[in-house]
Amino acid sequence: MKDYIYSIEGMDILVEQKALDKSIEDQAHRLQAYYIKKIREQSGMDRKAFCEWLGLPYRTLQDWELGQRVMPEYVLRLIAYKVQMEKAAGRL
């Protein structure tokens, strides 16, 4: 298996092979953690600034990015949408 592009709410995220090298049952959690981290990185913010911007507790985002907690799919899509719209408007 090789790297591939995942598109979520108009944002293209490169998924590297190393993010997929775990068991299938663990893969969904790892991918979700990978996606939220890449979305934050595309916003150009660190965790603290990203949390303040979204109104999220820091520990929640940290747990999502580390795969210690599962976020609802709709939350991932809403965050991706907000980042995409703010970038398009030139505010990020």
What is each of the regions a protein language model found here?
Residues 44-62:
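Short alpha-helical DNA-recognition segment
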Residues 60, 69-70:
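A secondary-structure capping/hinge motif
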Residues 70-92:
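DNA major-groove recognition helix of helix-turn-helix/homeodomain DNA-binding modules
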